[in-house]
């Protein structure tokens, strides 16, 4: 089985997920808003990353300033005649303005500075649970292995032990898998940059 994770997208969605506490009425537009934020960040990566670094994202201390800077950046481009104004992007901007006034974005506060994703092991365990009849061979990842060693997965009260970690240089199948994953990564990067 193959699974791909867009690290940038996954690192951004906590901003949008933090907004549901104050804007539950817009939950139906969740995917559109997340997509608009992702597309905007792809288009204006350097400027957004600068804001993230200055605010030690995802450990934002001054939520009001963080939200105001993101809002100003969106306003500067979303109102530009060269940039097609986007409903979801404007909705995000308005929601961020409110969050800034409340000084609250719960999922991007009180985290380790600059640590965008801490729990990669969840993606591994998810595969093991979804495909519980399969045996999963993962390339050695020491941090993930340590986290998974403390877990017990069950299906119908029966423990799951359908995974193992191996050194890629010792397993030809993992080497081939790494090669294919590398090619797919290049394809996805190309698609991100050209679509």
Which sequence ranges carry the predicted segments?
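Phosphate-ester processing/binding pockets and catalytic centers
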Residues: 1-195
């Amino acid at each position: 089985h193959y699974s791909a994770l867009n690290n940038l997208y996954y690192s951004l969605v906590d901003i949008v997920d933090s907004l549901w506490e104050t804007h539950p009425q817009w939950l139906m537009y969740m995917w559109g808003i997340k997509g608009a934020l992702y597309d905007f960040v792809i288009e204006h990566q350097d400027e957004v990353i600068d804001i993230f670094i200055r605010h030690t994202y995802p450990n934002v201390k001054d939520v009001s300033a963080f939200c105001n800077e993101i809002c100003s950046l969106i306003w500067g481009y979303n109102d530009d005649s060269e940039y097609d104004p986007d409903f979801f992007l404007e909705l995000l901007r308005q929601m961020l303005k409110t969050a800034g006034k409340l000084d609250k974005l719960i999922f991007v506060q009180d985290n380790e500075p600059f640590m965008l994703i801490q729990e990669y092991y969840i993606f591994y365990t998810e595969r093991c649970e979804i495909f519980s009849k399969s045996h999963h061979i993962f390339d050695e990842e020491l941090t993930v292995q340590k986290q998974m060693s403390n877990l017990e997965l069950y299906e119908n009260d029966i423990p799951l032990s359908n995974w193992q970690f191996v050194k890629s240089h010792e397993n030809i199948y993992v080497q081939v898998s790494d090669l294919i994953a590398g090619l797919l990564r290049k394809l996805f990067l190309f698609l991100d940059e050209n679509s």
